[in-house]
Amino acid sequence: VPTIFDAHTFALTAHAGQLDKGGEPCMRHLERVANAAQTRAGHARLIDGLDIDPMRVMQAALLHDVLEDTPRTAADLRAAGFEADIVETVTLLTKPQSRIAYSERITTLIAAGNLAALLIKMSDTEDNLCPTRIPPNAAFLRERYATAFERLKAAAAACGYTGR
């Protein structure tokens, strides 16, 4: 069974040489998202008593951009030994090939009711709201991410999550 280290190594290899929106190595974004999602999942489990494994959430968070931003596939994740729930969560978080509006993708993610995916997307959206990752003239991105974060937070709350 793959570990967090294995997920990190898989993501590091898959994203080798890639830079994020802020010009940093992609892995920094993935690590920030994974740490935030793991913290949220820990709250969900320990405080809210929800059936969620923070370590599995962290694995999925480290892998959340692999299918979207690299040639890797869900079959590659399965071949590497990642379990079905992790592959499903990563797949839910992956932008579809067809052009679908961001708000519709958030609606689809919310409708899936996958708490792990919601907490990871909250963490991803929160990281994307960081001023160093959004150009100063891109107020529309700040608005898009802020609106999505509130929708995701409300959906997580509907699942019983009481964290921020």
Regions found by a protein language model. Give the residues of each.
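Active-site helical microenvironments for divalent-metal-assisted chemistry
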Residues: 1-164
